[in-house]
Amino acid sequence: MTKRVALLAGLDASALEHVYAERLRPNPGAENMIAGLQAHGIKIALVSGGFTYFTEKLKMRLGLDYARANTLEIIDGRLTGRVLGTIVGAEGKRAFLHELCQTLGISTQQAAAMGDGANDLLMMNAAGLSIAYHAKPAVRAQAHTALNHCSLDGVLALLGVSAA
């Protein structure tokens, strides 16, 4: 992560807005899934090995309850090529799950975690329910269940929750 971020040194921070506007799209069914889960009092968090610039915008746009990602250092409108704070990787995702469950006053066994890559596995293994979403084979093999051929709102049927 640090080597990849270092390549961004000197880039004008406005490039992040361009990436967000032109390339970032929620997965199909995201809005329906979020609305359906929240209508039943379920809290939604986005935890990503990506960057807070994007996750905070998605949090606001989609009405998510929580978000955690890596913070890019920006000085005088330019990326420095450094990440501030602890890097959110596999261990960071698991730690966030534990932290969030503590904040919500629930056990990790009462939480569900969904992911698609190897850096999601520690978090998914710590949750009471793990869902592989269009995931790599190794992730599907370790998850409690997998959604391979549907949109994100397939989670509603999986959990027996009606749409909002």
Language model regions located:
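Short, compositionally biased "basic patch" segments
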Residues: M1-A9
